[in-house]
Amino acid sequence: MEVLSIAIVSFSFLLFLFFILRDSRPKNLPPGPRPSPIVGNLLQLGDKPHAEFAKLAQKYGELFSLKLGSQTVVVASSPAAAAEILKTHDKILSGRYVFQSFRVKEHVENSIVWSECNDNWKLLRKVCRTELFTPKMIESQSEIREAKAREMVKFLRGKEGEVVKIVEVVFGTLVNIFGNLIFSKDVFDLEDPTGGSVELKEHLWKLLDMGNSTNPADYFPIMGKLDLFGQRRAVAEVLQQIYDVWGVMLKERRGTKGSESKNDFVDVLLNAGLDDQKINALLMELFGAGTETSASTIEWAITELTKKPLVVSKIRLELVNVVGDNTVKESDLPHLPYLQAFVKETLRLHPPTPLLLPRRALETCTVMNYTIPKECQIMVNAWAIGRDPKTWDDPLNFKPERFLSSDVDYKGNDFELIPFGGGRRICPGLPLASQFSNLIVATLVQNFEWSLPQGMSTSELSMDEKFGLTLQKDPPLLIVLKARASNI
């Protein structure tokens, strides 16, 4: 009898919730699939929402809506729809939907990624735009990135003939690049995985993995404050562990303030008068977003090259013509148009953040003659846009040549190619990310040949994706490297 009573009460509550949600559905939304009671369209997502959204766009149009649990979501899937979201209505749609696991108050309030576009956010963006990522600052630190690329080559030469998970090596290299840009020191030892600040790398990996896990509260926000699954608490603990690692370095630098400047990011942030909470949040996002997205892009690039030996030959020939037998440097990159076209093509098919980061409508507005209600969540499917046959000729064919005769770029003005977003929320580290990808790909192609392990053919190489905050290759790429006797 008690079980029956509980069942009746539970069913009554769900039925009540269903009618509340049904009656509160906004009018004149973009078209979309009919939602099921309670769960909405959640069961249609699968493990690759970006691909499922692309299929829904083919049926319902470039701007469609759906219900994910109790959340109303609108998805843009064409350059025109993306321009409406990221440019025409950029201001009113600039709110950020913060994933429930990452709603750690001290971090969100000081975050350049998750906070609202308030005065604090504007200050952090200004510091990035006018201090950290200026052409002058980036150029002044090119020798650091080149030195770390050479160290990567030295490490990989020592692994010749062994099976290497290339994304881990690239990730470690990028962590050290950021360590030197920010603190003027390595934080990870490629030669000794147990040495250096290995815990920082491990904490970053752990945090990024948490970002790829599902939290039911994202679909039923009423559960959010309860943190029933402990995911927010776990994120807060890892964030604190990361802050503790570089807290010692920050304290040391504050103690020596006024002595000889190291001209690194910490100097800039301290001179800007930022407190530790702001610095912690900004450094977290530089390390986290800057390393993972670039590492993913480079892994996809090497995967495509593994399947396309002719493309490898073209990049290598261009390197010979421009660089000769010298080591490739960042100053060479503007003179390597085919390499740049190759990286663009990689980003077209494998955008690091396939749905960008979700936005939120600050007020009700009209987009493409449809109503976008206040608090609605908005996603832009950069993955689908990059594969849109109405925009790209033969879109599923990997063809860098398409960019040699095109002015389309990924700097936020061409909505056909938006791997880093656009509008006021565009990734502030875009100029640096571009340097990373081009330099490391060029360095690997110049110094190594590689093959798949155990005689695997390229036709057996999986191109499957693992969806998350970043679009990872699944499984990770394993290769066997062979050092080239000459750069020519």
Swiss-Prot record:
It catalyses: (S)-N-methylcoclaurine + reduced [NADPH--hemoprotein reductase] + O2 = (S)-3'-hydroxy-N-methylcoclaurine + oxidized [NADPH--hemoprotein reductase] + H2O + H(+). It is found in: Endoplasmic reticulum membrane; Microsome membrane. Pathway: Alkaloid biosynthesis; (S)-reticuline biosynthesis; (S)-reticuline from (S)-norcoclaurine: step 3/4. Heme binds at residue 427. Its EC number is 1.14.14.102. Belongs to the cytochrome P450 family. 3'-hydroxylation of (S)-N-methylcoclaurine. This is Probable (S)-N-methylcoclaurine 3'-hydroxylase isozyme 2. It comes from Coptis japonica.
